[in-house]
A protein has these predicted regions:
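Active-site loop/oxyanion-hole signature of alpha/beta-hydrolase fold enzymes
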Residues: 8-14, 37-40, 49-91
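Active-site glycine-rich loops that stabilize anionic/oxyanionic intermediates
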Residues: 19, 27-30, 90
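Structural signature of beta-strand start/N-cap positions in the alpha/beta core
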Residues: 21, 47, 82-85, 106-109
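Serine-hydrolase catalytic-loop signature spanning alpha/beta hydrolases and amidase-signature enzymes
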Residues: 27-37, 48
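Alpha/beta-hydrolase active-site loop signature
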Residues: 29, 53-57, 117
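Flexible "cap/lid" loop of the alpha/beta hydrolase fold
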Residues: 94-102, 106-138
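Conserved alpha/beta-hydrolase catalytic His-Asp/Glu region
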Residues: 130-160
Length: 160
């Protein structure tokens, strides 16, 4: 499915449905399309908000969990979101944990899927290689139990 990507206050995001807010945070090699099933199912009863995390746009020396939590805090403030159900996948789950610890008054529920955790202090041994289609392709395929799920279309979306 294709959803309108909105832009405001320097943030790019999807905002679908009405009701209580489900804020979804994608993973390191995630793409917005990873949330298609969630959006189509839950947007009937909830407002689904998905910011595009600036994982590859950030300066590698400044990029990290703290910066991504700060980005999320800025996004939540700019959109005036509160009483959130925060759902994070993979790296998005790690960001969600740290965000919740810093801002517990804003969180109604926390949902983690395949999350990295509190006892990890970074994004692995090295920062992802920018501009390497082969590297991104390998990492996206590695994300799934069945690597065939990592279609060229999905890899292209993550690479962009």
């Amino acid at each position: 499915m294709s959803y309108l990507i909105k832009e405001s206050d320097g943030y790019r995001y999807i905002d679908e449905g009405q009701g209580d807010v489900l804020l979804l945070l994608h993973g390191l090699f995630g793409a917005l399309s990873n949330w298609d099933g969630v959006i189509s199912h839950f947007s009937k009863n909830y407002r689904i908000v998905i910011p595009m995390l600036p994982i590859y746009e950030m300066n590698p020396r400044e990029a990290g969990l703290e910066a991504l939590v700060a980005f999320t805090e800025g996004f939540v403030a700019s959109q005036k979101l509160n009483d959130l159900t925060l759902i994070g996948n993979s790296l998005g789950g790690h960001i969600a944990i740290l965000y919740t610890l810093k801002n517990p008054e804003q969180i109604k529920r926390l949902v983690l899927t395949g999350s990295s955790g509190l006892f990890e202090n970074g994004m692995g041994g090295s920062y992802p290689k920018r501009g390497s289609y082969e590297y991104i392709s390998e990492r996206v395929a590695y994300t799934f139990y069945d690597p065939k799920v990592a279609t060229k279309e999905l890899i292209d979306e993550v690479f962009e």
